[in-house]
Amino acid sequence: MADETKATDAGQRYAQSLFELTIENNQLTKVEADLKSLRAMVAASTDLRRLLESPAFSAEDKAKGLTAVAAKAGFQLLTAKFLGLVASNGRAGDLMGAITAFVEMSAQHRGVVTAEVVTASALTAAQLKGVSTAVASALGKTPEISTRVDPSILGGIKVRVGSRLFDASLRSKLDSLKFALKRA
């Protein structure tokens, strides 16, 4: 799989159907938590990843495996049925993209944006709160922030929200200065 987190058309349709069902049954937050948990399990387990990706397993085997994982993890019945349906229809390869699409739909429904914050060193709780407040006031939406440390930016901060990048890193400032000096 090239990028299993990108939703295919089929994955998008499965996500949309599940999203509508969760709204109808008032289970949005619970099902979203289940799917995020499954995404983390797949990221951590090569065996689970192999089950989803390998053509050596039949659709029926994949459905049984995912249903067993859902039962063991205590997922909602709706989540378990969704996983079984996707796998039994031969779409296990679209599952991670469907999860990504579902999480995005849920965030949009709740008025939340996902922001990735990159800094040269770890942020304190107060700094993180300040970044969260700044992003919220700039975009008018509640941010869900994930942080990453990248010493190569030297200092400052980079904030990515969707396709927008706010780059206030020392590395980018130095690169701009270097470019300006070369042109002079």
Curated annotation (Swiss-Prot):
It is found in: Cell inner membrane. This is ATP synthase subunit delta. F-type ATPases have 2 components, F(1) - the catalytic core - and F(0) - the membrane proton channel. F(1) has five subunits: alpha(3), beta(3), gamma(1), delta(1), epsilon(1). F(0) has three main subunits: a(1), b(2) and c(10-14). The alpha and beta chains form an alternating ring which encloses part of the gamma chain. F(1) is attached to F(0) by a central stalk formed by the gamma and epsilon chains, while a peripheral stalk is formed by the delta and b chains. The gene is atpH. GO terms for cellular component: plasma membrane; proton-transporting ATP synthase complex. It comes from the Bacteria. NCBIfam families: ATP_synt_delta, PRK05758.3-2. F(1)F(0) ATP synthase produces ATP from ADP in the presence of a proton or sodium gradient. F-type ATPases consist of two structural domains, F(1) containing the extramembraneous catalytic core and F(0) containing the membrane proton channel, linked together by a central stalk and a peripheral stalk. During catalysis, ATP synthesis in the catalytic domain of F(1) is coupled via a rotary mechanism of the central stalk subunits to proton translocation. This protein is part of the stalk that links CF(0) to CF(1). It either transmits conformational changes from CF(0) to CF(1) or is implicated in proton conduction. GO terms for molecular function: proton-transporting ATP synthase activity, rotational mechanism.
